[in-house]
Amino acid sequence: MQLHEWNARLHGLVVFRALLGDPVVAKLAALTDRLEAADDTIAPLCDAVAAFEAALFAHTTNLGDYLSNAVLETETFCVRQAAAGQLSPVMEAALNSELSFLQKLCGLTLDALLEAADRQSRELAFLPRWEARQLDLTAAYNQRMREAGKKGYGMFAKHHVFTVENGQLVPVKYPDPQKLSELPGYEKEREKVIANTRALLAGSPANNVLLYGDAGTGKSSTVKAIANEYAADGLRLVEVKKNQLYQIPDLMDQLAANPLKFILFIDDLSFSSNDDNFAALKAILEGSVGGRARNIAVYATSNRRHLIKETLTDRTGDDIHEADTRQELMSLSARFGLTVTFQRPEKARFAAILEELAKQHHIQMPMEELLVKAEAFAIRAGGRSPRVAKQFIEQCESGVQK
């Protein structure tokens, strides 16, 4: 290809238009622009080459590797249409044409680019040369589209945990690495949540889930560990704060057509009796705004069985339908299809949790001594719980507890 062809095809991307916003690809486009400019000055060309290579080398020395990853992770209207089984012939032709060009671009070297521009490569002999290799991008991209239900596309291919900011999903780059295998105890309770999640992943009817119980019993850790465990199967977690509940219907609309499965996670949920967020959650759980998409479930944790903070003032108010109002508030938890209770561990369960954690952390202290010290630690910490057990074991590991 001649230089003007490289430049025109790069600037003429339609399906993969978003690539031009990628810092490395943008620098490559600037380099081809510089080469095509009627200017024999060497310094601006050196600047363009060096700027591109500096951007590329921050990630890899191989242009083909970088471009192939960028292409496979870019969210396009073609992959969205294909995921919905609606890819038109026009879009398919445009997709294949651009993939063919991008495949050639993966193999482009600096010397080949200079040759296409009729420039002498010896002029830039002092500059490093990036590596390049052609890949079968068409086959790889078609495979990615077929696997969109598990691997996703765009930011969903790179991340599996998200938060919400100003109504938009924001990836969490370093999510909690909690594993199910690291959560001893509460296996029966946890299995109910896992079974419901598997149903969601299978496309079967799945319940909204309320994980209720004492603080530190592993409710939040269970949800996060499940998200990590099943990320490779197409599960994504969206953490929603209580003051963002009103945004959930819009989030559901955004995610309903996505081939992945989503848990909308509300941690430490509770309401006061006059909380506007109560009505928002009620509408979501009842589906009054519309039918809930089968690829989405709401998981919430709470220390309160009925989610409502009741005060004496609430009970002595002037609501003439006080009993009905209180019952309405109390019944919110019943609108979750599945409620799983995590109670404080009794002594035997606490001991079993400690023993398993001690094995995981390679604590050598005799078990009887460990239990005595852990019980004393739990009294000072406010009572037995898996969180307290973990804190104690970590202190043993660090040498604080001897």
Question: What is the role of each PLM region?
Answer:
Residues 198-199, 243-268, 279-290, 323-327:
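Conserved alpha-helical scaffold flanking the Walker A/P-loop in AAA+ ATPase domains
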Residues 318-330, 337-351:
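Conserved AAA+ ATPase "SRH/arginine-finger" region at the nucleotide-binding site
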Residues 208-238, 250-256:
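Walker A/P-loop
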Residues 1-184:
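AAA+ P-loop ATPase mechanoenzymes
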Residues 343-402:
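C-terminal alpha-helical "lid" subdomain
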Residues 244-246, 269-272, 298, 302-308, ...:
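Conserved nucleotide-binding/hydrolysis micro-motifs of P-loop NTPases
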Residues 256-257, 272-319, 324:
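Conserved catalytic/switch belt of AAA+ P-loop NTPases
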Residues 175-208:
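Pre-Walker A (pre-P-loop) alpha-helix and adjacent loop at the N terminus of AAA/AAA+ ATPase modules
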